[in-house]
UniProtKB/Swiss-Prot annotation:
Its cofactor is Mg(2+). It comes from Vibrio cholerae serotype O1 (strain M66-2). The gene is glmU. Acetyl-CoA binds at residues 377, 383-384, 402, 420, 437. This is Bifunctional protein GlmU. Residues 1-226 are annotated as: Pyrophosphorylase.
Length: 453
C-alpha cells in the first residue's frame, strides 16, 4: 500500500527538563522518534517527512543515517501548522499518514488498519476510548459518524463528558489535506492552528470520516515527561518479554529484563534477572544467561553458560563454553568450543582456542591462543607500546603460569611452559620452559616493625 508519512517532532519537551529534544530521549535504547521511523520503513513508506524545530542540529546528528526529508517548523504554531510545513512535498493522489515522534509504540498492525480504512475521498483517524479523557480532544459524533474534534480547552461541559478521544493520528490524500490545511485558522483558546479542524472541514464538504481503534491504548500514549517515558518503557519491555515467553524462552522474572535491540533464541534458553540485551544478539540452544549480565551485538552458541555480571560486546562464544562471573568480552573476542574464561578476565580482539582456559584476573588483548592452553591468574598480554598495538601468539597445549607479562610482539610455540612471574619479551620455541624471576633472598632473624602504641 503506497503512502507517505509526516512525523511531527518539533516540540521542545519542557517537562522533560532536558537540553535534548524530547523525541531523542530513548525508549529501549533507541530514540523515540527512531521507533516511529522504523515502523514506517517496515511498512514501506515512500517518503518520510520529519518536521523538526527545537534542537535541529542535535536531531540531524542523531538521525544522520535516516532517509528522511527534513522539514523545519521555525515557529511552533500548532499541529496543523506543523503538517502544513510539509504539504509542499505531498503528491495529490498519495495517502498521507500523520504520526508523532513522541508516540513511539504505535504498531504496524494499527497503521495498516488505518490505511485500509481511509475512504477514497475522506479521512481515517485513530481514536481511543479512555476512562479519564482529561486533556485530550473529544470525538464529536452526530448519529454515528464523526463530525468534529473539540480540544479540551474549547470543549463545552457536555463535550467534556465524551470518553472517545483523538490521538492525532490520521490519513488523508495529499490533495485533500493540502486544501483543508490551507483553510485552517487559529480562532481558539490556544491561538494555534489545529490539525483536528480538518475533520470538521471534511465533514462540511460531505466527506466520509472513518474512526479506527488501536489494538491497545498504550500504542497511542504520548510522552511529555519522564514519568510517562518510564511507563512506556515498562510497557514495551513487558510486550517484548511476553513474546519471548511465548517462544519458549525462560525469563526468571519478566519484569526484570530489558531488550534494547533484537534477540534470536534457540530452545531451552534460560535468562536470569536484570539481564540487558542490546543491539543484535543471537543465543543458541540450552544456554544459560546469569543475573545482571549485559549482552550486546554478540553470538552465544549451544550449551554455553554465561555466569552472573558478565559483559559481552561484539564477541563470539562457541559451544559448551563457560564465561564469568564478572567477565568482560570486548569487540573482536572469540571463544572456541569448550573454552573457559572466569572472574575478572577481559578479552579484546583475541581468540581463545578450543578447550583453553583463562579462569582468573587476566587481560588478553590482540592475542591468538591455541587449543588446550592454560592461562594462569594475573597474566597480561602487554599489547600496547604507547603508540601501536602488537600481537601475542600462543600455540597449542601451552601452560602460562600465574603473574606473567607477555610483552608483544611475541610468539610461544606449542607445548611450551612459561613459569610463574615471568616477563616474556622474546619468542619461545616448542616445548621450552622459560622462567625469569628476581633472585630469592632469605633474611634470617628479621622482625616486623612494631606498631606505635
Amino acid at each position: 500500500m503506497k503512502f507517505s508519512t509526516v512525523i511531527l517532532a518539533a516540540g521542545k519537551g519542557t517537562r522533560m527538563h532536558s537540553n535534548m529534544p524530547k523525541v531523542l530521549h530513548t525508549l529501549a535504547g533507541k530514540p523515540m522518534v527512531k521507533h516511529v521511523i522504523d515502523t514506517c520503513n517496515n511498512l514501506g513508506a515512500q517518503n518520510i517527512h520529519l518536521v523538526y524545530g527545537h534542537g535541529g542540529d542535535q536531531m540531524q546528528q542523531a538521525l544522520v543515517n535516516e532517509n528522511v526529508n527534513w522539514v523545519l517548523q521555525a515557529q511552533q504554531l500548532g499541529t496543523g501548522h506543523a503538517v502544513d510545513q510539509a504539504s509542499p512535498h505531498f503528491q495529490d493522489d498519495e495517502k498521507i499518514l500523520v504520526l508523532y515522534g513522541d508516540v513511539p509504540l504505535i504498531s504496524e498492525d494499527t497503521i495498516e488498519s488505518l490505511l485500509e480504512a481511509q475512504p477514497t475521498d475522506g479521512i481515517a483517524l485513530l481514536t481511543v476510548v479512555l476512562e479519564d479523557p482529561t486533556g485530550y480532544g473529544r470525538i464529536v459524533r452526530k448519529r454515528g459518524p464523526v463530525v468534529a474534534i473539540v480540544e479540551q480547552k474549547d470543549a463545552s461541559e457536555e463535550q467534556k463528558l465524551i470518553k472517545e478521544v483523538n490521538t492525532g493520528v490520521l490519513v488523508a490524500t495529499g490533495r485533500d489535506l493540502k486544501r483543508w490545511l490551507a483553510g485552517l485558522n487559529n480562532n481558539n483558546a490556544q491561538g494555534e492552528y489545529y490539525l483536528t479542524d480538518v475533520i470538521a472541514a471534511a465533514h462540511d464538504e460531505g466527506r466520509a470520516v472513518e474512526a479506527v481503534h488501536p489494538s491497545h491504548s498504550i500504542e497511542v500514549e504520548g510522552v511529555n515527561d519522564r514519568i510517562q517515558l518510564a511507563r512506556l518503557e515498562r510497557a514495551f519491555q513487558a510486550r517484548q518479554a511476553k513474546k519471548l515467553l511465548e517462544q519458549g524462552v525462560m525469563l526468571r522474572d519478566p519484569a526484570r529484563f530489558d531488550l534494547r535491540g533484537t534477540l534470536q533464541c534457540g530452545s531451552d534458553v534460560e535468562i536470569d534477572v536484570n539481564v540487558i540485551i542490546e543491539g543484535n544478539v543471537s543465543i543458541g540452544n540450552n544456554v544459560v544467561i546469569g543475573a545482571g549480565s549485559i549482552l550486546k551485538d554478540c553470538e552465544i552458541d549451544d550449551n554455553t553458560v554465561i555466569r552472573p555480571y558478565s559483559v559481552i560486546e561484539g564477541a563470539t562464544v562457541g559451544e559448551n563454553c563457560t564465561v564469568g562471573p564478572f567477565t568482560r568480552l570486548r569487540p573482536g573476542a572469540e571463544l572456541r568450543d569448550d573454552a573457559h574464561v572466569g572472574n575478572f578476565v577481559e578479552m579484546k580482539n583475541a581468540r581463545l582456542g578450543e578447550g583453553s582456559k583463562a579462569n582468573h584476573l587476566t587481560y588478553l588483548g590482540d592475542a591468538e591462543i591455541g587449543k588446550g592452553v592454560n592461562v594462569g591468574a594475573g597474566v597480561i598480554t602487554c599489547n600496547y607500546d604507547g603508540a601501536n598495538k602488537h600481537k601475542t601468539v600462543i600455540g597449542d597445549d601451552v601452560f602460562v603460569g600465574s603473574d606473567c607479562q607477555l610483552v608483544a610482539p611475541v610468539t610461544i610455540g606449542n607445548g611450551a611452559t612459561i613459569g610463574a612471574g615471568t616477563t616474556l619479551t622474546k619468542n619461545v620455541a616448542e616445548g621450552e620452559l622459560v622462567i625469569t624471576r628476581a633472585p630469592e633472598r632469605k633474611i634470617a632473624g628479621w622482625q616486623r616493625p612494631a606498631k606505635k602504641k
